Amino acid sequence: MIYEFLPEADEEFREASRYYENEAPGVGLAFITEVHRVISVVMLHPRAAKKVRGTVRSKVLFHFPYNLLYSIESDVILIVAVAHQKRRPTYWRSRLNTALRIT
């Protein structure tokens, strides 16, 4: 199984890592490392996280107030959002129309 980010998810991941790195050197790298750790867990156990809408599942990051939202599409883990837990909780749903089928 492989993974890929939707372009919007990739951009918000990069923005969050830049933000954390600007706040304190090394924290941006810690954020990147945590996102990749969660992706590794998801790739090992893709159906373990709870479904939050249609085929989209959510996995919480440790030490950061973010969720990794993803869908399993054939042999690809499609990352829909790297979403802050306190900001605009459902903004990513508009991405589903073009990227996924809602069931």
Spell out what each predicted region is.
Residues 67, 71-103:
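Enriched for short, Lys/Arg-rich terminal
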Residues 44-78:
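Basic/aromatic recognition patch in beta-strand/loop cores that engages polyanionic ligands
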